[in-house]
């Protein structure tokens, strides 16, 4: 029998202390989230991997979305899943998931993503060229955001002029906005993507990634318009949010650990491998996306009944002391392979190779040009985004040098 725990209102500002407490009590706890949603929160590494792959668990929001209302203390504040966006592979189980992922995976193999490196380097260099020693800037605004949004917009064939709209829509969709704000943002993005998908479908096929996806034909099977819109939404939001927050969180971690920053300045060849440690320590995603139990599930001796929302804390699993020694310490020389920052199993992040490449390029060029950058605000004044899903800062003020 578990005790229902109410998570504090400032949970997203300091989740690690909460996770440490919960993890010490057991692998999974029944909790009320700050906005009143009752979930079973998984905080241990081994049980997180089980929960992410268990056949007793489903990701189908069409069939399980009603649980968000059933388990909320304030059903009126529960955001509705935008129907246009629900049909992406993140919200489906096999065989529907298998079909959609097969069409997308081909474009995101490590080999194909590596072909993007020269263009990513070019975009990063252009952004850095616009910055100067002595500047005080929000690093997210001038660098961490424009780099990945430019890359993903080019892959999807979307004019870069729309990037500020996407940032605003994404913020509304991923943060604790009101249902009305979320619905308005979802409607605006859906309308834009419908127009974009229709235009590409009516145009002659070309060699761009999204055109290939629109016109892809697997043994007579093609994505329909709604599937393409939902897929574009997933790629657009996940394709930039992950890298924005990975860069921002990593820079903050380095500025708070100058000895580790010095190691990377002295040995920049360690940056690619250190990516895994940054993902482990302060990954860009707090919890895995929506899951619920179709059947009762045993997690480390705790039974989660059927019909419950299962929330897997990726950041908690990655700081489990049973899996990683000194888990709260940044160690850029650590072998952090096996972390679950990108998920685990069939829903492992398809864009992981692209996020890793963008991070490698961004950190290499940033530290080469501004090796002595410093934080331009007291760490305790920094505010994390008001989102259970995303782990990222509102702003990251730095002084370039």
Where on the chain are the PLM-derived regions?
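Cytochrome P450
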Residues: 1-401
């Amino acid at each position: 029998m578990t005790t229902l725990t109410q998570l504090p209102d400032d949970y997203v500002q300091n989740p690690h202390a909460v996770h440490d407490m919960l993890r010490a009590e057991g692998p999974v706890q029944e909790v009320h989230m700050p906005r009143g949603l009752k979930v079973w929160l998984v905080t241990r590494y081994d049980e997180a991997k089980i929960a992410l792959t268990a056949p007793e668990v489903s990701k189908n929001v069409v069939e399980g979305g009603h649980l968000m209302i059933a388990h909320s203390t304030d059903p009126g504040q529960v955001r509705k899943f935008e129907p246009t966006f629900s049909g992406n592979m993140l919200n489906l189980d096999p065989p529907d998931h298998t079909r959609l992922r097969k069409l997308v995976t081909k474009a995101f193999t490590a080999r194909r993503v590596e072909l993007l490196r020269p263009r990513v380097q070019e975009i990063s260099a252009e952004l850095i060229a616009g910055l100067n020693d002595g500047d005080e800037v929000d690093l997210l605004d001038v660098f961490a955001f424009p780099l990945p949004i430019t890359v993903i917009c080019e892959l999807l064939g979307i004019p870069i002029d729309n990037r500020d709209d996407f940032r605003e829509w994404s913020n509304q969709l991923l943060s604790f906005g009101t249902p009305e704000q979320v619905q308005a943002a979802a409607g605006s993005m859906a309308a834009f993507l419908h127009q974009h998908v229709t235009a590409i479908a009516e145009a002659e096929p070309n060699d761009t990634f999204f055109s290939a996806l629109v016109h892809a034909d697997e043994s007579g099977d093609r994505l329909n318009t709604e599937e393409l819109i939902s897929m574009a939404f997933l790629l657009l939001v996940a394709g930039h949010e992950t890298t924005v927050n990975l860069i921002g969180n990593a820079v903050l971690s380095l500025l708070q650990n100058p000895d580790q920053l010095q190691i990377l300045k002295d040995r920049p060849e360690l940056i690619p491998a250190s990516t895994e440690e940054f993902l482990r320590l302060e990954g860009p995603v707090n919890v895995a996306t929506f899951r619920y139990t179709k059947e009762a599930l045993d997690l480390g001796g705790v039974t989660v009944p059927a019909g419950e929302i299962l929330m897997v804390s990726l950041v908690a699993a990655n700081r489990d002391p049973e899996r990683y020694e000194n888990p709260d310490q940044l160690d850029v020389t650590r072998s952090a392979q096996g972390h679950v920052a990108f998920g685990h199993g069939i829903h492992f992040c398809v864009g992981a190779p692209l996020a890793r490449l963008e991070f490698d390029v961004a950190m290499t060029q940033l530290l080469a040009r501004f090796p002595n950058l410093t934080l331009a605000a007291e760490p305790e004044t920094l505010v994390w985004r008001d989102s259970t899903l995303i782990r990222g800062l509102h702003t990251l003020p730095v002084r370039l040098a």
